[in-house]
């Protein structure tokens, strides 16, 4: 076992050859590299599978032995300072490694089909493999300096992937927004790291925790400065995990390809913030104010994310706000000290959310055959509906993910969310009420997404896409979206070979799509069904990862069932996390009996079903005449009270749809303020600073020109002027001082 741990340092570097070889191949042998491009997808999956097997083996060793392994290489710069590099293998590392690799493999397989017609295919897989390398390096780091290095690499990869189609202005703006927002948190993280190094003299986690605990115990530190440094460290997690108030980048990150959304929201970027807080929890737990701040930020994010998801029309943005809310649950659990519950929910949510995002990608893929390449249309739930008849497998798996996030047993998120809800009562009744109410909101908005997408009738009618001439679909060039020439087809990239990784079937894209010339948000009447094309189910290459993630969603919750009945211990997760739990809570007991579990579960499931019922009542087409996704039913008679109620509902709807006006506030006060300051600085620099400098030169030039014309070149003239000046000076002197 010791030898296995000794080779664990290689984990982050196994996927690294793929982006390096792709880059070298495109420079040295571009034609051959592009011709055999699907070979790189196979290598990406193969190398990440090796990491997954290695990570699973390490996890089994840890479950059996409850061991933690750390290895450090020291680079001594001078006698007073040495920089250490190493790797740490503990339960948190193994959990994150398995999450990254399992979800990453599914996303890579899925992407082989999803990105098959994109000329940036090779660039996409290079970025994805480098993303996996960065995240694996982050979770295996043994000190804060290494974490910061890989932390920045994760941010870089997310910037590249969110802006993958950067020729689209919205995608370019989205990646810049994500980058700048995360720079705020990253700057705080760097300052916090340097602050704690100044306090403890170490970057290594074990030394840092031990030294800091001794300093706190002996009251040898400035508590205010320590709190400030801890807040700065936490700021990095707030930005990376899209917690309030640095959450604004997350919905815009949906401008990247859908597989990227699945990876970012499930196991990489947003999970990095939760990982950082979990890793530093032994540091935070001795600072009570920080733990309370973490829980407050978590509960605000829980409620805010859920309310902002209520009115979203874009299916990916709705799921993005769902991610924000669920990350808030994890942050709340960490702030309450519920280390096990937070990591359990991280695991279950990762598989459920990856399933939902890949399912949404399958839906978008099928809608593009009708509306063409237009994210504003293909991702709009107002143009969907009735897809259960056309994409039945996607519908079943999407329903599994939806019910899991709703908290319906026996699906994965039921077990983890229930633990967080129960722990919240022990921490704060106010927090508990908000958390339980938000669980009902979660069920409401998730089932709203499901009903708008799959129930009713297909809301796209080609008569709404006016125009006598058919127009081709868009192809996506190497550097983004680019219109193809007329009468060209999207599937002409390579007609001589199969385009899919697991299947040789080709599906031609229907050419019946038309450009839309009228507002597409007005949903046509359901009785008008004259459509000339319908969506179809995705290829097996996309369905296989969705099916596997569906199995994870069904069964992964079993690892954390907290029952210990009659000597039968089903709680694998507690045994897995034993070293970390014992470090944080030496006398903790996570087991429950059946009676206690059933009492809590009945309440949470009832709340979830109530949210589902309200969503079904409002959004199921049979019972509702909703149009444009509003919350108004026409069967209620109008009256003064009803009109007031409608105004309130519309106000809430506008508040939710417009992201609580937080983005507008930031744009007006922060972005506008910075632009105003920049304009003033530019004016001051050009008119004042440059004016002074240029003014000296102009004055010198004028004086020189004047002197040039006064001097004639004769000595007699110079003597005459000299004597005249002296005479005038003497005359003035005599007149001024003659009285004295």
Curated annotation (Swiss-Prot):
Q: What class of enzyme is it?
A: translocase
Q: Which GO terms describe its molecular function?
A: NADH dehydrogenase (ubiquinone) activity; quinone binding
Membrane topology value: Multi-pass membrane protein
| Record-listed E.C. numbers | 7.1.1.-
Which of UniProt's keywords are assigned here? Chloroplast, Membrane, NAD, NADP, Plastid, Plastoquinone, Quinone, Thylakoid, Translocase, Transmembrane, Transmembrane helix, Transport
Q: Where in the cell is it found?
A: Plastid, Chloroplast thylakoid membrane
- What function does this protein fulfil? NDH shuttles electrons from NAD(P)H:plastoquinone, via FMN and iron-sulfur (Fe-S) centers, to quinones in the photosynthetic chain and possibly in a chloroplast respiratory chain. The immediate electron acceptor for the enzyme in this species is believed to be plastoquinone. Couples the redox reaction to proton translocation, and thus conserves the redox energy in a proton gradient.
Q: What is the protein's given name?
A: NAD(P)H-quinone oxidoreductase subunit 5, chloroplastic
Which organism was this protein described from? Solanum bulbocastanum
